[in-house]
Amino acid sequence: MKKGEMIYQGKAKKVYETDDKDKVIIYYKDDATAFNGEKKGQITDKGILNNNITSSLFELLEKNNIPTHFEKKLNDREQLCKKVDIIPLEVIVRNVAAGSMAKRLGLEEGTPLKTTVFELSYKDDSLGDPIINDYHAVAIGIATWDELKTIYDMTASINDILELFFRKLGIKLIDFKLEFGKFKDKIVLADEISPDTCRLWDAVTNEKLDKDRFRRDMGNVKEAYEEILRRISDN
């Protein structure tokens, strides 16, 4: 597979075209951002860690019949993926109150929820990725009702698979965000699943093992990501 021109650069990844019009190469960077890009930094080897973590988790989901854009890991920093048309939504899955939801609703972080909460965020940096509801998404043409149902059904299955997987590793899956795209008119999971996109707490100590360590200047960010990869690799 021949690597071509860079066609997109985001906060954490670069996307390159290939000699196959249906495939791209995704490169994972060490750049770290928080608060919609207001806080910026670098975490040594973060790209390597997130590539390895995401590759393992996407392989797990594929084995459990979740369609994804992932094809294979090429090297420490790169994956071969299907070229998808990204749907400009983030689906945020909240199993435990934390982060912005806890602040917004006046809940103590770590409060158990009586049901898992799904939130939608409209992916638009200029607007600060606002929270929207299903009606907004349909009204402004982001997705149809049928597409939202597919996305929610997939999201529920992904949450079940990942929550059980992490529980076996001694990790609480507090919340996470997902992105989806269309490949030949089929909705597939895209982007990444990593400590950049999940809140992951040690099940015994509640130690944070995710990007909150960067957001909140807690230190030992790389070590937390390494611990997640170690537990996944030892499984």
Curated annotation (Swiss-Prot):
It is an enzyme of class 6 (ligase). InterPro entries: SAICAR_synt/ADE2_N, SAICAR_synt_PurC, SAICAR_synth, SAICAR_synthetase, SAICAR_synthetase_CS. GO terms for biological process: 'de novo' IMP biosynthetic process; cobalamin biosynthetic process. Pathway: Purine metabolism; IMP biosynthesis via de novo pathway; 5-amino-1-(5-phospho-D-ribosyl)imidazole-4-carboxamide from 5-amino-1-(5-phospho-D-ribosyl)imidazole-4-carboxylate: step 1/2. SUPFAM superfamilies: SAICAR synthase-like. It catalyses: 5-amino-1-(5-phospho-D-ribosyl)imidazole-4-carboxylate + L-aspartate + ATP = (2S)-2-[5-amino-1-(5-phospho-beta-D-ribosyl)imidazole-4-carboxamido]succinate + ADP + phosphate + 2 H(+). Belongs to the SAICAR synthetase family. This is Phosphoribosylaminoimidazole-succinocarboxamide synthase. It comes from Clostridium kluyveri (strain ATCC 8527 / DSM 555 / NBRC 12016 / NCIMB 10680 / K1). The lineage of its organism: Bacteria, Bacillati, Bacillota, Clostridia, Eubacteriales.
